Swiss-Prot record:
Belongs to the universal ribosomal protein uL3 family. Residues 250-290 are annotated as: Disordered. One of its GO terms (cellular component) is cytosolic large ribosomal subunit. Methylated by PrmB. The keyword RNA-binding applies. InterPro entries: Ribosomal_uL3 (IPR000597), Ribosomal_uL3_bac/org-type (IPR019927), Transl_B-barrel_sf (IPR009000). It comes from Jannaschia sp. (strain CCS1). Residues 255-274 have a biased composition (Low complexity). Pfam families: Ribosomal_L3. This is Large ribosomal subunit protein uL3.
Length: 290
């Protein structure tokens, strides 16, 4: 089951305290106006995919062809564009916005980004080599990589040999990271541990390929329009429930008032009856006294 991933901006790292008192280091990712810019179908393009755009770019710094693409999609110019392959059933309409509820707490994801550049580094830092001995005849070459091959045969260094060179600034994917918390109102996704890239860098988040597809995942995606519709329905349901409760309270008040009025009338009738019965007895006593 293939569904769309998301484009997020790396805000930084912090920690969260759980209910049991444990603290978990998390990386905070932010969804910045993540919208569908285009979609590819099997009929027109030969495959199914959605193109997402995130961030906001100045129109004057956007090329004319890209301005046409954004205008066709009726979205503002985006800073980052990424295409995600999806199943035909999980295509999303152009212009829809994806929110942080796309993932849920406890779900495993794969995060891809550009690692922090380290420049030219030696073999010990770049490949975790142990280096040479600190003494016993080793001079100057303590942090060198040592031998790079054989002798006259083959007479060359094999391609791909681990040596000193440029480190970092490469596309890296970290797999099976766990979602700790999401914040839809602020568009935040908090992932346990570190993710590739520096602060302010763009990363892509996808469902983990080495884990079973979660049964409670939202298909085709968690959309802002669907959330707004659900909130509207919930508000209408709450208003209807409040009106029903108010009507029920009014009915109960009317019944109570009617019951009180009936009991009052019954009490007045009993008092009147007692008064009418007591009047003749008083007159008889008066005559006996005379």
């Amino acid at each position: 089951m293939l569904r769309s991933g998301v484009i997020a901006k790396k805000v930084g790292m912090t920690r969260l305290f759980m209910e049991d008192g444990k603290q978990i280091p998390v990386t905070v990712l932010q969804l910045d106006k993540l919208q569908v810019v285009a979609k590819k179908t099997s009929d027109s393009d030969g495959y199914s995919a959605v193109q997402l755009g995130a961030g906001t770019a100045k129109a004057k710094r956007t090329s004319a062809p890209m301005r046409g693409v954004f205008a066709k999609a009726s979205v503002e110019p985006k800073r980052k564009l990424v295409e995600f392959r999806v199943d035909a059933d999980n295509l999303i309409e152009v212009g829809e916005e994806i929110i942080a509820d796309h993932y849920f707490e406890g779900q495993f994801v794969d995060v891809t980004g550009t690692s922090i550049g380290k420049g030219f580094q030696g073999a010990m830092k770049r490949h975790n080599f142990g280096g040479l001995r600190a003494s016993h005849g080793v001079s100057i070459s303590h942090r060198s990589h040592g031998s790079t091959g054989q002798c006259q045969d083959p007479g060359r260094v094999f391609k791909g040999k681990k040596m000193a060179g440029h480190m970092g600034a490469a596309r890296v994917t970290t797999q099976n990271l766990q979602i700790v918390r999401t914040d839809t109102d602020r568009g935040l996704i908090m992932i346990k541990g570190a993710v590739p890239g520096s602060k302010g860098g763009w990363v892509t988040v996808k469902d983990a390929v080495k884990k079973p597809f979660p049964e409670n995942a939202i298909l085709p995606a968690a959309l802002a329009s669907a959330a707004a519709e659900a909130a509207k329905q919930a508000e209408e349901a709450a208003a209807a429930a409040a009106a029903e409760a108010e009507a029920e309270a009014a009915r109960l008040a009317e019944e109570q008032a009617a019951a009180e009025a009936e009991s009052l009338a019954q009490a007045e009738a009993e008092i009147a009856a007692e008064g009418s019965d007591a009047a003749p007895e008083g007159d008889a006593d008066k005559k006996d006294g005379e």
